[in-house]
Amino acid sequence: MSDLKIALTHADAREERTVTTGTKAWELFQDDPSVIAARVNGALRDLAHELADGDQVEPVAIDSPDGHDILRHSTAHVMAQAVQQLFPDAKLGIGPPVENGFYYDFDVDTPFNPADLDKIETAMRKIIKEGQRFSRRVTTDADAISELRDEPYKIELIGLKGSGASTGSTTEAVEGASVEVGAGELTIYDNIRRNGDVAWSDLCRGPHLPTTKRIPAFKLMRTAAAYWRGNEKNKQLQRIYGTAWESKDALEEHLHRIEEAERRDHRKLGRDLDLFSFPDEIGSGLPVFHPKGGVIKRVMEDYVRQRHVEEGFEYVGTPHIAKEGLFYTSGHLPYYGEAMFPPLDVDGMDYRLKAMNCPMHNLIFRSRQRSYRELPLRLFEFGHVYRHEKSGVIHGLTRVRGFAQDDSHSYVTKEQAPAEIKHLLDFCLGLFRDFGLDDFYLELSTRDDSKPDKFIGSDEDWAVATKVLEDVCIASGLELVPDPGGAAYYGPKVSVQARDAIGRTWQMSTIQYDFNQPSADRFDLHYTAADGSRQQPVMIHSAKFGSIERFIGVLVEHYAGAFPPWLAPVQVQAIPIAERHNDYLYDVAKRMQAQGLRVEVDDSDDRMQKKIRNAQLLKVPFMMIAGDDDVAAGAVSFRYRDGRQDNGVPLDEAIRRVADAVASREQV
């Protein structure tokens, strides 16, 4: 045997090692049970991978992001094996890892029910206990088709190998398919029993755990219907979702987070707190705000409008529809056509519901000659836009078909662009802090160089724009995560990702550098420079919340419906102990309303404790309770949402407490 030299990177330390020919990756990590795979020369590999001379090797721990994906992918295989044991006629779709879990799609005659999931879990535990080995083997297209002749969906994937498998498919479906086939060699994974028999096989690129025994904790979560490859024209399959974690404690923590997320679900709270609804008569993805929800929306919009003015923006307004040709000029047609509603025939001419505001803002800029002295020129509006979202992705307020976008466009010189992007990023982060979100990271979306037909503009323009955004992000000191291929067709973007009270991440602001729409081929925007020459501005798109509706949904869940006083629909619930105290509290309410505070008096026939309970259920920040002694003293019992109560508080003091809490924009 000859010696091989490899480099092992572990815990930020690099070690040169000499090993013998035939050494497998697992031999480097025998003393570390947390390692379940290896990254060899940048590519994820099974621990059974044979090393070569010069390899750069890194361990992959089960609790790392890559480790989670491998664990969940392997668990998906075990689940599919169990399903085919219990339901021999089930045909396999795809089974990739996803955020916090995995799924597998099956073609079965009857949808799975909860009892089926229990049986599948039991069968999975037996497979895990057996310690079946995941074994990779390379095959040819012809051999794979022969071996998998009873699996029509797998054969279809083999036919799509290397083609991208994307025609008519959702992004999730494309990514799921890529787990099974890709542009490289075709592989099958066998689950092998200890006696050497093959228990089950699946078309897959891997990598996988060494054995099924390395699955510490899992749970099947739910079932759903899903179209094959995410295309509504294809057959509807049955999908089983599950989750897997590196320990039972980690699984329990995840399940607790799910319970907490369900408790905070904005759709349920919106109904319970009478904030908004989704009437079938109007249509899917088109929310209606009730009076209390309307208060939150108005307060948010008023504050955001005020802050934009303070930051140098000018408020504008544009219509909901426009001639179709406008969107060809901007490039949204054809690049963004699938997300737009079909054309409307108006007097023999095609119009479109707008899906974005930027083309109309460009027309405002172009409406007269502009001077360099006017730049940066910042335009802003709450523009109502409409997106043709598929019904399967619509979700409460966070994914809708019609929404108000807090949309702004800055027109700047190339030299002003870095400072303007920094200004916009600081503005966005400050707004989120005002609304109680203060845990962020940034994501930089760039173009996919392998798909030039999906992007417009020169390589040089893209390089300059990307560098400007990247420099500003790095200077912010926030974590920066790359998102290759995620850019808009007209330029790169940075998005602010905010974590809520239970650690979930939400994409919030987007800031996009656009060198295309101002160009002569598009809107031909220009300004007169100091030397009298005609120059093209850079256009910077920015949506602070992306969607007012979506941000309200996020805040409902972040606060679990218990809004800080400045946002609460009702800031004070006045509770008379008896009917004779009603007039006193109505006078108190008028006094507070004159100061702009939102007060309601509960003059129902309910007993006082029931009134307090009702106010707690509505998550009202403050209660003012009055009886005979309070009326005589010109005071109230001042009660907080958390149950604390101060008795005999003079009216002036009670009102000041509320006003100060509202002005501070802090939670109580």
Curated annotation (Swiss-Prot):
- Places the protein is found: Cytoplasm
Give the residues the record marks as binding Zn(2+).
C358, H409, H541
Region entry Catalytic, spans: 265-564
Principal location: cytoplasm
Which cofactors is this protein said to need?
Zn(2+)
Q: Give the enzyme's EC designation.
A: 6.1.1.3
Which Gene Ontology biological process is one annotated for this entry?
threonyl-tRNA aminoacylation
SUPFAM superfamilies recorded: Class II aaRS ABD-related, Class II aaRS and biotin synthetases, ThrRS/AlaRS common domain
> Which note does the record give on the cofactor?
Binds 1 zinc ion per subunit.
Q: Which PROSITE patterns match?
A: AA_TRNA_LIGASE_II, TGS
- List the keywords (alphabetical): Aminoacyl-tRNA synthetase, ATP-binding, Cytoplasm, Ligase, Metal-binding, Nucleotide-binding, Protein biosynthesis, RNA-binding, tRNA-binding, Zinc
* Top-level taxon: Bacteria
Question: Listed GO cellular component terms?
Answer: cytoplasm
Q: Which GO terms describe its molecular function?
A: ATP binding; metal ion binding; threonine-tRNA ligase activity; tRNA binding
Signal sequence coordinates: none
Q: Which reaction does it catalyse?
A: tRNA(Thr) + L-threonine + ATP = L-threonyl-tRNA(Thr) + AMP + diphosphate + H(+)
Q: Which residues form the TGS domain?
A: 1-61
Q: Which family does it belong to?
A: Belongs to the class-II aminoacyl-tRNA synthetase family.
Which NCBIfam families does the protein's record reference?
A: thrS
Return the HAMAP family for the record.
Answer: Thr_tRNA_synth
Q: Which PANTHER family match?
A: THREONINE--TRNA LIGASE, CHLOROPLASTIC_MITOCHONDRIAL 2 (PTHR11451:SF44), THREONINE-TRNA LIGASE (PTHR11451)
What role does it play? Catalyzes the attachment of threonine to tRNA(Thr) in a two-step reaction: L-threonine is first activated by ATP to form Thr-AMP and then transferred to the acceptor end of tRNA(Thr). Also edits incorrectly charged L-seryl-tRNA(Thr).
The annotated subunit structure for this chain is: Homodimer.
Name of the protein: Threonine--tRNA ligase
Name the encoding gene, please.
Answer: thrS
